[in-house]
Each structure stands twice: as C-alpha cells, then as structure tokens.
Amino acid sequence: MNLLDKLNFPEDLKKLNEEDYKVLSSEIRKFLIDSVSKTGGHLASNLGVVELTLSLFKAFSFDKDKIVWDVGHQSYIYKILTGRKEGFKKLRKYDGISGFPKRNESKYDYFDTGHSSTSISAALGIARARDLKKEKYNVISVIGDGALTGGMAIEALNDVGFRKTKLIIILNDNQMSISTNVGGLSRYLNKLRIAPVYNKLKTDIHASLDNSNLGKNIAGKISKVKDSIKQLIVPSMFFENMGVKYIGPIDGHDIDAMTEVFIKAKEINEPVIIHILTQKGKGYALAEESPSKYHAVGAFNLESGESNASPKNSYSKAFGKALVNLGAQDEKIVAITAAMPEGTGLKCFSQKFRDRFFDVGIAEEHAVTLAAGMASNGLKPVFAVYSTFLQRAFDQVLHDVCIQNLPVVFAIDRAGIVGEDGETHQGINDLSYLSMIPNIHIVVPKCLEEVDVLLKWAINKNAPVAIRYPKGGNIIDTLSPIKEVVEGQWEIVNRGSKVCIIATGRMVQHAMIAKEFLYEKGLNPTVINATFVKPIDKKLLENIKKEGYNILTIEDNIIKGGLGSAVKDYLSEIDYKGTIRSLGYDDEFIPQGNVEILYKTYKLDYENISKIVMKLYD
C-alpha cells in the first residue's frame, strides 16, 4: 500500500513529515496521470498544482477556512484529499464526480466554478459576509495568470484594495491559460518574475540600517522614498497600487517555502496576493512539452499520449479551414478569439494571417466590442467562441453590435450538449438569448460540410450573424450539404406525409436516423432542416398548415425561446389546428455525462424521436 492509499481527508495529512510530502507529490501525479488517461479530464493544469495544493492543506484548515478555485479545473488534488479519491473512477461521468468544484458534492467545496475570472469576486463576497457576521477564518482565492487577464478579476481587485478586506489571493502563474497567455498584464507578470532582486535589496537595506544608530535615525526618511526606489527596480506595482499587498514570486513546487508564506499571510489583516510560479504539466514529459495539448484531454494512451478515440473531422476544424479559405480571398476578414485559438479552430488562421488575427485573452466582452469597432470601420470580423462563453458578452452583442446592425459574425462552437464538463459548459442557451435580439440572423449547419457555405453567407451578409455548431463531427455521413443559402429558407431533407419533423443542426441527423427506423415500420415523416432559426421559414410553415401535418420540433437547446418557441408562436398567429410537440431541454441545467447518454436521458435520441412521431401518426 502506498502513502496516498492511506490518505482520504485533510486531517490525515497532518501526520506527514517533509519526506512524506515529496513521496506524496510523486504518488499524486502518478494517480492523476493513470486516472485521467482512463476517464479524460483536465490534466496539465492539475499536474502543475500538486505542491501548491499540498501547501494549502499544510497551512490552512478547510474544516473552517474557505477556498474558491478560479475556473475550478485545477481542483483535482483538492478533491482527492477531501474524500473523493475513489470517485475518480467516474470522473466527469454521468452520476460521477464533477471535474469542477460543486457545493452539492462535498462540504469542502464552498463555491461552484467553471468559468474564468470569478474567484476573487466570490471569495471577497464570502470574506465580507464573514466580517459582517463577526466570524474568524481565512478566505482564499486561487486564480491563474490567464484568468487574471479577465476584466471581472480586475474589477474585483479594484474593490478588494479599496475596502481593504482581509483576503488571501494566490496567483498560480504558469504562463498559460488554455493556450499561451497574451496581453499587457501577461507581460507585466513576466517582469514580476525578476522582482526578487527588489525584495533582496529591500531586506539588505533594512538590515544595514537597523544595525547602526545613524540608520535608525534616517530610516523614516528613507521610507519616504522607498516607493520611488521600488518603482525603479520593479517595472510596475500594479497590485500594490490597487491596495493589495504583493508577495512573491515563489517557487510553486517548493512546499516548505509556500507553506511558510501562507502561514504568514494568515496574520496579515489586509488583502494580499501571493505570486506562485508553477509548471503546467509537471511530472509527465509529454504534458510538459505540450501543455496546451494536455490541458483537457479525452482518454489516452499513457506511453504515446495519443487519444484513444479514432481521429475524425470536426466542426471546429471545418470552420477553421473554411475561414482560412475565405480569408485568402478577402483581406477585410479578421479573426478574434478570447484565449482559445486551438479549441475554436483558429490556429491555422493565426499562422497564415498574423496581422488579421487577434487573441484578446480571457475577455469575451472586450472581444465583442472590439469586433463591433472593426466592423464599424469596414472590416469583416469573425469572433470564434464557445457557446457557454458567449453568454458572458450578452450586453455587448445587444448594445454594441445589434443596435448598430454591425456586420459581426459570431462563430459559436460547442453549441448544444458538450458532455463531461457539465452545467457550466453546456451550450444550450444561445438560440434562446440570441433570438430575442433584433437585427441578428441565426444559421445552423446540419452537417459539417455545410459550415463553409453558411460561413461565406454570414460574412457577406452585412449584418450581425450567428453560426452555431456542436462539439465533434457528423453522426451520419449520408446528408448532402445545401448548395445555396436563401435567407430564411429551410430545406426539405425528406418528403413524407402526415407528420413533419422540423429539426435544426445536429438534430437533423437524429431525425434522419429516426426516419430510417420509422420507414421500416411503414411510416415516412417529412424531415425539414431549419437552416435558419432566425428568421424562420414562414412560407413553409404556412404550407405545412395547409397540408394538415402534425409537427415535431427538435433542437439541442432549451425549448423556451428557441426553435420550438418560434415555430409555435407563428403557428398560433396563423391559427394552426394540428398537434405540435417540441423536443429540447426544459427549464433546468444539464449535468455532466457522455453526450449519447445525455441525449437519451433528455429524449433526444432516435428511439424517443421515433416513439413521438408514431404517436403523432395516431
């Protein structure tokens, strides 16, 4: 039995000596690599915070102290040592433990996270509640250097420093978010890595002055110019100028050094930020060499590092290829990402058209208004973003793009169910919140071969357009892409009788699988591809009414405000008397799990579609 096998809860760690912690660090890394290679998950970021997490357990008592992990994907070690080690067999699986902190999972998880840059705000709220209730415990925010580039984190720092609330902020600096960090704040942190020269000089000066009478007499005068000296040696005092005491940088793989600083930080009655330097992917050579590749992985082969899933084309790749081709034809096309060039398929564009590629860091709000400014001055911006992250910029989409009717294209990746990352990452709301905004058009490819023709139409529309597509690739490869895009016109994929299935996006593929199943039973429903969710095809709906069809709408989105709502609203206007059913998600959050399992659970699989269609034939 190894050491890790004997440890389950924080109190178990109190018995360990210095050598034990070194052994434990190695065992945890092995456990992580073995476990994540089977289940998939966030690997590189967790490998980088092993010693940091152990130091937190040494310095704090999480039966009373409270910690908020920014994003939360780096909380695996914390979970392992708070009673959830066995749960890693079902990490990110349906009914298994989450890959992010969850209050309903453990008493040690104090705040749910999943999106970036929220931890300082949340921790500050917890700390201020503590103070108002006159309670005594420490509140810690752990935030990465990538997340610190997010505007919300800077807003929170501004508030922290103004009121001087006692709060410990740990900056986990691995020079990465998902991809390499960008921007002015990232450059600033690079400069801070040489700041120990200032700290050593300050210590030497104080020691010299304290050892002489003259020094003691002039110490007060020296302190008046201390800040000026500090500014000369450290390029910027960003944190301290905001009212937050800065300590660091500190080796993020030295448990003793971090523990000592954390213990001292507990005695500081004002906000403090502790700058920790870590290596993303530490302990697994392949992840050290390619931390972005191993940031989030599916199940993989330990020796080769290659994914166990068979490689196939994806919507992200199809989008990236299409944008490169269009960019070669039109120099006005520019691409924008919020720190995710690889995940959104923009890597190739960034290499081929460096001057027309803009990575703004974790800053979706800024990205959208940047795109609006570009569009107002004659460019054709395409902002590639995951569905779950676009919702962070809702106001900018409405206020800065759509009110002015500016030609910005939103390439919405990971739309619909994404699976294992759970509630915080499912992309099931975009059709609803975008449909309510005037001026915007929403198009959805039924297969990845349609991405290029719809993207070309979107870029040339001269109005706001959202093109929405899911994670992964095709389910079936028998569908022919549309050749021409006509605004607001839907495609009849299969002509049948009595029942009409109106589906959008990947759900068209589900509908066609169901159609084949039904055909064997002597039923032949019409299947319509709702290429446009906004505007809808009113003429076709009027024809469906005249022909007396019953209708089933299907979407990988919440039903309220989506395709089903739009169809029902219009049919009500034209006094439709038939039966209409809608499939999608009800008023709830969708948990983690395999995509196919989730589709089946929420009745979006072909078997359930077939059952509903058969009832509509009765």
Curated annotation (Swiss-Prot):
One of its GO terms (molecular function) is 1-deoxy-D-xylulose-5-phosphate synthase activity. It comes from the Bacteria. Its cofactor is Mg(2+); thiamine diphosphate. This is 1-deoxy-D-xylulose-5-phosphate synthase. Pathway: Metabolic intermediate biosynthesis; 1-deoxy-D-xylulose 5-phosphate biosynthesis; 1-deoxy-D-xylulose 5-phosphate from D-glyceraldehyde 3-phosphate and pyruvate: step 1/1. The keyword Magnesium applies. The lineage of its organism: Bacteria, Bacillati, Bacillota, Clostridia, Eubacteriales. Its EC number is 2.2.1.7. It catalyses: D-glyceraldehyde 3-phosphate + pyruvate + H(+) = 1-deoxy-D-xylulose 5-phosphate + CO2. CDD domains: TPP_DXS, TPP_PYR_DXS_TK_like. It is an enzyme of class 2 (transferase). PANTHER family: 1-D-DEOXYXYLULOSE 5-PHOSPHATE SYNTHASE-RELATED, 1-DEOXY-D-XYLULOSE-5-PHOSPHATE SYNTHASE, CHLOROPLASTIC. SMART domains: Transket_pyr. Mg(2+) binds at residues 145, 174. Keywords: Isoprene biosynthesis, Magnesium, Metal-binding, Thiamine biosynthesis, Thiamine pyrophosphate, Transferase. Belongs to the transketolase family. DXPS subfamily. Pfam families: DXP_synthase_N (PF13292), Transket_pyr (PF02779), Transketolase_C (PF02780). Thiamine diphosphate binds at residues 73, 114-116, 146-147, 174, 284, 364. Catalyzes the acyloin condensation reaction between C atoms 2 and 3 of pyruvate and glyceraldehyde 3-phosphate to yield 1-deoxy-D-xylulose-5-phosphate (DXP). Binds 1 Mg(2+) ion per subunit. Homodimer. PROSITE patterns: TRANSKETOLASE_1 (PS00801). GO terms for cellular component: cytosol. GO terms for biological process: 1-deoxy-D-xylulose 5-phosphate biosynthetic process; isopentenyl diphosphate biosynthetic process, methylerythritol 4-phosphate pathway; terpenoid biosynthetic process; thiamine biosynthetic process.
